[in-house]
A protein has these predicted regions:
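Long, low-complexity segments enriched in small/aliphatic residues
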Residues: 227-297
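Conserved ATP-binding subdomain of kinase catalytic cores across diverse folds
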Residues: 50, 55-68, 78-99, 104-138, ...
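Charged, compositionally biased N-terminal leader segments and the immediate start
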Residues: 40-52
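Intrinsically disordered, low-complexity Ser/Thr/Pro/Gly-rich regulatory segments
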Residues: 36, 69-70
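Intrinsically disordered, low-complexity regulatory segments in nuclear proteins
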Residues: 16-21, 74-81
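Acidic, low-complexity intrinsically disordered tails
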Residues: 8-43, 498
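Short Lys/Arg-rich cationic patches that frequently serve as NLS/NoLS or arginine-rich RNA/DNA-binding motifs
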Residues: 1-11, 54-55, 60-63
Length: 498
């Protein structure tokens, strides 16, 4: 991937300002292809790069063509498509009988609409100003896509946990989607406009603060950093008692969310004493024997994408049941399956999720990814491995019936910080923390010094993005109202009652 200055129409002079910043390229390697920042003009293994001070100065120069104040405010582009039409078009290719459920979940609130309408925001973001620095982005960075999960050492950590929309694009896209979600979650929780603005500014402040701490770190130290929620404490945003209580309760719940607990709650023994996953239509439904065989065949391909030692481990399990299981809001209608495997004795259960990976919502508005990443399951896996500080060792991908999938553990101490619990100090604490976590993800795959230099030490960017998030929150409320009252959407939702 050649250096992309994502501010559409950047001049040659502006582009020249980035000469000291490393390119974002994808290097094709036989044993695991990775995204990495480097300068393709030189051999980086033998040539030293620019100092972080010089790279930070380069970032500051970018303000000349993309002032930080330019990120403020929101006005719909005159050519903006009808958001309802975009959402309905995104139903194409999904499981038909699940589309009404998707529509119902999206109609629940403006925040739910934002979650499910990534295609709408992708179009909107593509018309916003950007600095010109691309990184591997999450692509769907909202408050409910941060969560708890376990490391291989069974330590519960907090990080980004959904990567279906990951791609290469402007770092601002992740930051703006996160701030819009904070604004809308605040509305759901009854926060005033002043309180929402404070929380959004905390997101950006956390992002800037984290970049400032990370941009001079040794590379290995940066990549080894992960966040233990009980130890979340920031210089500007101390851990208050209410936030500590929320963390404690959430972590306790996550620790109880493991394969052993799921085996007892989500499965039962049949008349022959064999484990079977409980059915709960339309969320969990039975599938045909033919489809089960296809899924098992896909698992064989998936295993080949794991590290060799993990391949050895997972082959000690055998499949005993497979069902279709609906997940999420925007993902409803994509094919997703829950697979129960049994290992060392019939109490040793392992639950895997095989989920269809569709094209990233931002894909139409960004340069095409290299051929090696045309497989959307592979794209999701590599994005997660790069952005997540401590990943799932059983994360892999496969193809089934011509469709790309990725596979991951269903329950490995997974949990959430429920957004509905947050108000006052906890809302601001987690807003700051999520901004900081996003910055760390971007620092792993981009040039933190250049981005930090652009963002700066003042609140200029914070104020601008706060203006944007509030205005975009208003826009999303309007879009949600149009969606919830649309006759076609209402007709689809009504099918759930018949």
């Amino acid at each position: 991937v050649k250096k992309r200055h994502a501010h559409r129409g950047m001049s040659a002079a502006d582009a020249a300002a980035l000469q000291g910043a490393p390119e974002l390229i994808v290097e094709n390697l036989e044993d695991g292809k990775i995204f990495e920042p480097r300068d393709t003009e030189v051999d980086t293994l033998t040539t030293p790069g620019e100092s972080w001070e010089k790279r930070a100065a380069t970032g500051k120069q970018l303000r000349e063509h993309a002032p930080r104040s330019a990120h403020g405010g929101w006005r719909p582009d005159p050519g903006r498509p009808d958001p309802v039409t975009l959402v309905l078009a995104s139903n194409k290719g999904r499981v038909a009988e699940l589309i009404p459920l998707r529509m119902k979940r999206m109609a629940a609130s403006p925040f739910a609409f934002l979650r499910g309408a990534a295609v709408v925001m992708a179009w909107d973001l593509s018309r916003t100003p950007v600095s010109g620095l691309d990184v591997v982005i999450d692509g769907d960075c909202h408050v409910d896509n941060f969560g708890l999960f376990g490391t291989p050492a069974e330590q519960v950590v907090l990080d980004l946990n959904d990567f279906d929309e990951t791609t290469i694009g402007p770092w601002e896209y992740d930051l703006k989607r996160l701030t819009a979600s904070v604004d809308l979650a605040g509305r759901d929780n009854g926060l005033s406009a002043k309180e929402r603005r404070k929380a959004v500014k905390d997101v950006v402040a956390g992002y800037r603060w984290s970049l400032d701490r990370l941009h001079s770190l040794p590379v290995l130290e940066l990549w080894n950093r992960h966040t233990v929620p009980e130890r979340m404490d920031h210089r500007q945003k101390k851990l208050d008692k209410k936030s500590a209580a929320i963390i404690r309760k959430s972590v306790e719940k996550a620790r109880a969310s493991n394969n052993a607990a799921l085996l007892q709650s989500a499965a039962m023994r049949n008349d022959d004493g064999q484990w079977r996953i409980k059915l709960d239509p339309p969320i969990t439904t039975a599938i045909s024997g033919h489809l089960k065989r296809d899924i098992i065949a896909g698992l064989h391909d998936y295993i080949e994408t794991l590290a060799p030692e993990r391949q050895f481990m997972i082959r000690r399990y055998h499949v005993v049941d497979v069902v279709r299981r609906v997940v999420g809001v925007g993902s409803v209608g994509l094919r997703a399956y829950l697979i129960l495997l049994i290992g060392n004795g019939d109490e040793d259960g392992l639950f895997l999720q095989m989920k269809e990976a569709g094209p990233a919502a931002l894909a139409p508005y960004l340069p095409v990814l290299p051929k090696a990443y045309k497989h959307d399951g592979q794209r999701v896996v590599y994005g997660q491995r790069l952005l997540q500080a401590a990943g799932d060792p059983l994360l892999g991908w496969c193809t089934m019936d011509g469709r790309p999938y990725y596979v991951r553990q269903m329950k490995n101490f997974k949990g959430a910080i429920p957004t509905e619990w947050l108000s006052g100090a906890p809302f601001n604490f987690f807003a700051f923390g999520y901004g900081a976590l996003l910055a760390r993800a971007h620092a792993r795959v981009g040039d933190a010094a250049v981005i930090s230099g652009y963002c700066g030490g003042s609140e200029t960017l914070d104020e601008a993005v706060a203006d944007w998030a509030e205005a975009y929150g208003d826009q999303t409320e309007q879009d949600h109202e149009s969606f919830a009252n649309d006759p076609d959407v209402k007709a689809l939702i009504a099918e759930l009652k018949t």
